[in-house]
Amino acid sequence: MSLDMQEWRAETTAIVNELLADGSNPDLEYDIEHHFACQDFDQLEKAAVDLFKAGFEVTDAEEMELDDGAPIFCFDATIERKLDIETIVADIEKMLPILKKYGVDYDGWGTYFQE
C-alpha cells in the first residue's frame, strides 16, 4: 500500500470512528462526498467523466480563487455507502489512478451525521 493510501486509510478510519462515537447510525447508507481540485478545467472535466463512468455521481465544477489569486476548479463525486472503512478506502483506491491520469488533486471526503 502506498504512503498516500496509508494516509487516506488513517483519515478514513478517524472520520468513521468519530462519526460512530458521536452516535451516527452505523446501519444507514450515507452520501460519501469525495472532493477534487485542479487548475486545469479540461483535465478536471475528464476526471469527472471517468469518475461518473466508475459509478459516482458528480457535481458541476465550481471556480474558486486561491490565496494568491490563481483560479482553481473543484467538484465532488458522491456515492451512497455505509460507514464502512474498507468500502470507502476501496473507493479511494479506485479513484486515485483516474486522478493521477489527469493531474487532479484528491482533497478527502466527508459526509453528514445521521441518527
From Swiss-Prot:
Looking up HAMAP family in the UniProt record yields: RraB (MF_01888)
Q: Which organism is it from?
A: Aeromonas salmonicida (strain A449)
What protein am I looking at? Regulator of ribonuclease activity B
What the entry lists under Pfam families is as follows: RraB (PF06877)
Describe, as the record does, how this protein assembles with itself and its partners. Interacts with the C-terminal region of Rne.
- A cellular component term (GO) from this record? cytoplasm
Q: What's this protein's function?
A: Globally modulates RNA abundance by binding to RNase E (Rne) and regulating its endonucleolytic activity. Can modulate Rne action in a substrate-dependent manner by altering the composition of the degradosome.
Annotated InterPro entries = RraB, RraB-like_sf, RraB_dom
